[in-house]
Structure formats: structure tokens, C-alpha cells
Curated annotation (Swiss-Prot):
Protein's gene: ZAT2
Primary site of residence: nucleus
Summary of the tissues where the protein is detected: Expressed exclusively in pollen.
Source species taxonomy: Eukaryota, Viridiplantae, Streptophyta, Embryophyta, Tracheophyta
Keyword vocabulary terms for this entry: Metal-binding, Nucleus, Repeat, Transcription, Transcription regulation, Zinc, Zinc-finger
Protein name: Zinc finger protein ZAT2
Low complexity bias: start-end ranges: 106-115
Annotated transmembrane regions: none
């Protein structure tokens, strides 16, 4: 009996029964999550949150003040102070001008308006401006209009293009070079003939851009070209004079020179 009592731990507990069970406790309990249905999720997401309602400030009407320079109204003093930077020409600082500033401006304006008196010079300037405004506008009749006349039928046209189109109707005349401008300068005079006494030839003085040689009658466009051409005739004349033994550029010899030359020739002949 002693062995059985020592081995059983519940032997000392009175009223202990073998049918009593102790509750079991879990060391790591887990919380259950409740799943929301689709209807509950849609209703919760679509429902708007209430926005805070801002009530108007009863003192806002007292804060809003107009600008003393331009009259614009602003809802806050901060905006009004920022707007006053747009008026740097004012002589005072802040929102409201000083009390004596308005009276001084009014007095200056009244004194300036009463003391202003137009001078005689200003009266003259005003009268001149009125005369210029009421004067007649000068017409363009005094201007000379350029006109072009057709040589074939003597019709007058106001432009060179109109005359060119008209000249196309004349089949006997090619081009429009026969037209004449009424306002152009008169034609140059005909060439004059001058007789050269040394050579007995007539020299023509041709006016205009054409330059004619008086020896071979060749025409050149410029005086420089004619001068270069004339050197050919001068060189030919010099060659002919050298062949004849007479140089026109050297002065004639005296009687003493001729006798000396003859004596020298005689001596050389011996």
C-alpha cells in the first residue's frame, strides 16, 4: 500500500475525482478577421466624408478696405498692403494717407488752377493749330505727271507699261522703242563739222556716248577707247616722217647749221 500512495500525486487532494478535466490554454492566440462583403465595401468607399463648413467672419466687412489711390477693394489687409506697392509715387507710407495730406493737395490744386493764366505765346500756338486744322489740303495738281506718247497714232499713256501694251497692236513697228516721253529732255543737237587746215580733212564732233574717229570714222563707246585708238594713227604719221627724213617735232635748222653739214659731208666724201 505504501508504494501506491507514494506514486499517486492526487492521493493527498481530498475530493479528487478522475473525471474532472482542466481547460487547455493556447500560448499564441490568433485574432479572427472579419471579412466584409462587396456591398459593405462599396457603401463604405462611396460615402463622402463630411467637409468642415467655414462660416463667414463677421469682421470681414470691417477689414476689407478700398485703395485710396485707385479705389480697388481687397478682402484682407495683407492683400491691400501688397497692392500699395503698385503706387510708389505716393509721398506717404502705409494704407491711409495722413489727415493733413488731402487738405494740402486740395489747396495746391485750387491755387494752381486759380493762378494759371495762358500767355500770349500759348494763344498764338493755339491759333496756329486751329488755322492748320481748318486749312485746305494742298492738291497734287501742281505735280508734273509723266506721260508717254505713241509715235504711230499719237496716243498718250500714263505709264511705260501701258504704252508697251499698246505698241503690240502696231504690226509695222517692232518693239516699243519708237515711243517718246513728253517730259524728257530735248534731243541732242546734230554733230558739227570742223575743217582741219593742216590736213584739209573735216573732223566731226559727235555729241553723246558715241565717240567717232575723225580719220577712219570708227565709233567708240568712251573717250578713253578713242584716245587709245588715235595712237595708231600717230605712230603711222611718225613712221612716214622718218622715212622722208623730216622730223616735225624738231625745230628747223639755221643757215650756219646747213653750211657746217655740207662741209662735213664734203670732207667725208674725200
Amino acid at each position: 500500500m505504501s508504494n501506491t500512495s507514494n506514486s499517486d500525486p492526487n492521493s493527498d487532494i481530498p475530493f479528487a475525482s478522475s473525471n474532472v478535466t482542466l481547460p487547455s490554454y493556447n500560448q499564441n492566440p490568433r485574432r479572427k478577421r472579419t471579412k466584409l462583403t462587396n456591398n459593405e465595401v462599396g457603401s463604405s468607399s462611396s460615402s463622402p466624408r463630411p467637409k468642415p463648413v467655414t462660416q463667414p467672419d463677421p469682421d470681414a466687412s470691417q477689414i476689407a478696405r478700398p485703395c485710396t489711390e485707385c479705389g480697388k477693394q481687397f478682402g484682407s489687409l495683407k492683400a491691400l498692403f501688397g497692392h500699395m506697392r503698385c503706387h510708389p509715387e505716393r509721398q506717404w507710407r502705409g494704407i491711409n494717407p495722413p489727415s493733413n495730406f488731402k487738405r494740402r493737395i486740395n489747396s495746391n490744386a485750387a491755387s494752381s488752377s486759380s493762378s494759371w493764366d495762358p500767355s500770349e505765346e500759348e494763344h498764338n500756338i493755339a491759333s496756329c493749330l486751329l488755322m492748320m486744322a481748318n486749312g485746305d489740303v494742298p492738291t497734287r495738281s501742281s505735280e508734273v505727271e509723266e506721260r508717254f506718247e505713241c509715235d504711230g497714232c499719237k496716243k498718250v499713256f500714263g505709264s511705260h507699261q501701258a504704252l508697251g501694251g499698246h505698241r503690240a497692236t502696231h504690226k509695222d513697228v517692232k518693239g516699243c522703242f519708237a515711243n517718246k516721253n513728253i517730259t524728257e529732255d530735248p534731243p541732242p543737237p546734230p554733230p558739227q563739222e570742223i575743217v582741219d587746215q593742216d590736213k584739209g580733212k573735216s573732223v566731226k564732233l559727235v555729241s553723246g556716248m558715241n565717240h567717232r574717229c575723225n580719220i577712219c570714222s570708227r565709233v567708240f563707246s568712251s573717250g578713253q577707247a578713242l584716245g587709245g585708238h588715235m595712237r595708231c594713227h600717230w605712230e603711222k604719221d611718225q613712221e612716214e616722217n622718218q622715212v622722208r627724213g623730216i622730223d616735225l617735232n624738231v625745230p628747223a635748222a639755221t643757215s650756219s647749221d646747213t653750211t657746217l653739214g655740207c662741209s662735213l659731208d664734203l670732207r667725208l666724201g674725200l
